[in-house]
Amino acid sequence: MIQQETRLKVADNSGAREVLTIKVLGGSGRKTANIGDVIVCTVKQATPGGVVKKGDVVRAVVVRSKSGARRNDGSYIKFDENACVIIRDDKSPRGTRIFGPVARELRDNNFMKIVSLAPEVL
């Protein structure tokens, strides 16, 4: 589960490498985010010449989580790292490529562009 102050790897080519969670969106008093949830982050590490710079406040969607997510059939999916994709206000990704697998739960939350760009959907 992703909470405030959690650091995540960025799984796109927007220019950010690592972000720190500021807030979990979706209701007052919400503490944790899971796969498919939108969070507000600040960029902690960035590559030179990228779209986003260090210190920028951005929105991102969680695409991989160490704690995993429970599916309707009772199975769980877990990943080796916490990762996110930086998005615009209309839920489209700011980068043009997605690195690594993403969870199928993104399709349920209408992040179809991220699902189509991903090399593998688990």
Swiss-Prot record:
The UniProt record lists the keyword Ribosomal protein: yes
SUPFAM superfamilies: Ribosomal protein L14
Disulfide links within the chain: none
Any one annotated GO CC term: cytosolic large ribosomal subunit
InterPro entries: Ribosomal_uL14, Ribosomal_uL14_bac-type, Ribosomal_uL14_CS, Ribosomal_uL14_sf
Keyword entries, A-Z: Ribonucleoprotein, Ribosomal protein, RNA-binding, rRNA-binding
Entry-linked PROSITE patterns: RIBOSOMAL_L14 (PS00049)
GO terms for MF: large ribosomal subunit rRNA binding; structural constituent of ribosome
Pfam family, one: Ribosomal_L14
GO biological process, one term: translation
Quaternary structure, from the entry: Part of the 50S ribosomal subunit. Forms a cluster with proteins L3 and L19. In the 70S ribosome, L14 and L19 interact and together make contacts with the 16S rRNA in bridges B5 and B8.
Function: Binds to 23S rRNA. Forms part of two intersubunit bridges in the 70S ribosome.
Record-stated family: Belongs to the universal ribosomal protein uL14 family.
Listed PANTHER family: 50S/60S RIBOSOMAL PROTEIN L14/L23, LARGE RIBOSOMAL SUBUNIT PROTEIN UL14M
Name listed for the protein in its UniProt record: Large ribosomal subunit protein uL14
Organism: Bacillus licheniformis (strain ATCC 14580 / DSM 13 / JCM 2505 / CCUG 7422 / NBRC 12200 / NCIMB 9375 / NCTC 10341 / NRRL NRS-1264 / Gibson 46)
